[in-house]
Amino acid sequence: MTYNKRLFTSESVTEGHPDKIADQVSDAILDEILKDDPNARVACETTVTTGMALISGEISTSTYVDIPKVVRETIKGIGYTRAKYGYDYQTMAVLTAIDEQSPDIAQGVDKALEYRNDISEEEIEATGAGDQGLMFGYATNETETYMPLPIFLSHQLAKRLSDVRKDGILNYLRPDGKVQVTVEYDESDKPKRIDTIVVSSQHADDIELEQIQSDIKEHVIYPTVPEGLIDNETKFFINPTGRFVIGGPQGDAGLTGRKIIVDTYGGYARHGGGCFSGKDPTKVDRSAAYAARYVAKNIVAAGLADQCEVQLAYAIGVAEPVSISIDTFKTGKVSEAQLVEAVRANFDLRPAGIIKMLDLKHPIYKQTAAYGHFGRTDVLLPWEKLDKVNVLKDAVQA
């Protein structure tokens, strides 16, 4: 029997990938600032390369943070603890070039927003977006996490690749690594099987390729992928270049915000272009993307669509979003216009409203900086809540 199959591929990277090192460092600095100053304005960019890290950006805060210490602790936690790994938290140089947030931006964002549980309506209305831009959120019912299967499995495999290294199961692995998963969909657009898995992991110099391939299948792939998705036709490419000894920042420079598709939906949904890491929640690139995921996930969980993509757009200094758009890809149980109306009535999508709704002024961001910001099963994130399901059901029936 033949059918019209469709293949879709997504990728993830481990926490030791250079770009992910940069994301984690930026968010570790953000978290450290938010611990003492929840009203801080942070736009923190990190560059990592051989033997050094450069921290730049704009930070306005009333607290003090030992940035080099935070950088070194983050690098140590990732696993770059010896010079032979190509990067060493003890001997690397840490350079800083930090300015304050531009007063031209600050005056349009927030004049007097104070950190307290009960933010007044006047303060919410007075808090404008930190920039113009468009953000997307997405959800699908093809997995229990409301994420597309290719990116979900990619993250699970990347996390497992890191875990077997840190737990000493495969102690010859090194921190840098990448995973890619190709899923085959059937004629009903449901996941049917895994067509291809690609794993590349940095490793010690004296390990044979055949051992790496066998160990990664046994300890990473088979324990992670749900039974029935791998079959005799599934293709495996494990360290297909044959050698991956030089890795991390020694192999490639890393920059904050270079893995925006890994951070979101693996290319399965659209992306507005703005990254997340290193940005405080007044930056709608981050907070509005979280809110859009929150909206989309609750719509799908309410049974109002099998898939849902939400677009939000903002103008700098303006509180209300300039547009809200919803696409259910012809899977909606009610019209998209009804969904937009229900969302407008039940979600406060102004920047300060999002911060209040999702309680975003806390140091919760470093844990999002590797293995995805959405659909996580290992950490609890406020934009993954399903507390609007009944509200949305009632709203579309009214």
UniProtKB/Swiss-Prot annotation:
Mg(2+) binds at D19. It is found in: Cytoplasm. Pfam families: S-AdoMet_synt_C, S-AdoMet_synt_M, S-AdoMet_synt_N. One of its GO terms (cellular component) is cytoplasm. Binds 2 divalent ions per subunit. Pathway: Amino-acid biosynthesis; S-adenosyl-L-methionine biosynthesis; S-adenosyl-L-methionine from L-methionine: step 1/1. ATP binds at H17, D176, G177, K178, R243, F244, D252, R258, K259, K279. The keyword Chaperone does not apply. Its cofactor is Mg(2+); K(+). Keywords: ATP-binding, Cytoplasm, Magnesium, Metal-binding, Nucleotide-binding, One-carbon metabolism, Potassium, Transferase. One of its GO terms (biological process) is S-adenosylmethionine biosynthetic process. Coiled coil: none annotated. NCBIfam families: metK (TIGR01034). Homotetramer; dimer of dimers. Catalyzes the formation of S-adenosylmethionine (AdoMet) from methionine and ATP. The overall synthetic reaction is composed of two sequential steps, AdoMet formation and the subsequent tripolyphosphate hydrolysis which occurs prior to release of AdoMet from the enzyme. This is S-adenosylmethionine synthase. It comes from Staphylococcus haemolyticus (strain JCSC1435).
